[in-house]
Amino acid sequence: SQDRCLYVSEMITARAFVEGHARTHKLASFGADETTRRSIQLYGTHPDTLAAATRLLIEECGVHHIDMNFGCPVRKVTASGGGAAIPVRPKLLQKIVRSVVKSAGSVPVTIKFRKGIDDSLLTFLDAGRIGEGEGVRAVALHARTAAQLY
């Protein structure tokens, strides 16, 4: 059944979306024939920006689901404190998840994360607990560390 199908978009950056970057808005757009659940994979490091992007995605793009990406291992992303580096800072992770869940209202939010940065810094248990505590609908574990890449 189509109601059970979920296709998550490419990852978009909350800041670029809020700032109105055309390329990011194109990634977040859906065709008229795309009636299956509209799901966006969202990335960012600032709770307020992520909350604003969530509101805009729901109100302007008709998004039915937000998937937060805390698993990106790309050095450019993790070096700036994003992606797989966020769960290393559990208070920030909690603030981000809380702000997005609150902004999403009845729209479901899920989170994706890795085991950790490397085998000496595993964060997945805390990340899962934070997600559960903040009301995400589901968590997804990419069962590799950021150091293992893809």
Feature names for model-found ranges:
Residues S1-E60:
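Glycine-rich, positively charged N-terminal anion/phosphate-binding segment
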Residues D48-G82, I86, P90-Y150:
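Alpha/beta enzyme core
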